[in-house]
Amino acid sequence: EDLDEEDILLRNKCRKMSDDELNSIVPVWATDVRKMELPINHPMYSNRIFMQCNVDKLIKNSTNLYDVVFNKKFDGFWHDESRFANTIERWLNKECVDPPMWDISQNKSFIISDGRHRTVLAQYIGVKDIIVSIPIYLKEDAQELLEANELIEK
């Protein structure tokens, strides 16, 4: 993997973080359309809604997380290290990150179609509930399986 100096410094910063420091991170989710990287997924422009759900239940009820590994050592031996380090840095700086997207796959299983690493990272740092973007037609499934509650747009 080719790393620039900024990536190396960021990984080194994360490598030095204690478990207590990691657990004190508060995720900041972008629900304001102006702050989203992919605003096309905002309820204003899509058939999606934001819901707050239990992260453990989200992971348990999503079938496509088998290859997502979070190794807190930041030792350069795992391919998604930069994704985790960049998300940690953004959250430390109180910068918004798009919520994960929960969908149903072609074989009718539930998946996280975007934001798998953000989801696993949130669980690792001890977050109980996260915000997810789901299609309106999965609202009842989310309420039942994920203990989800719809966020009211302000």
Which residue ranges define each predicted feature?
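Solvent-exposed functional surfaces
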Residues: 7-35, 127-129, 141-154
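Short alpha-helix boundary/capping and kink motifs at helix termini
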Residues: 1-16, 20, 25, 41-111
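A short, basic-hydrophobic beta/loop patch
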Residues: 94-149
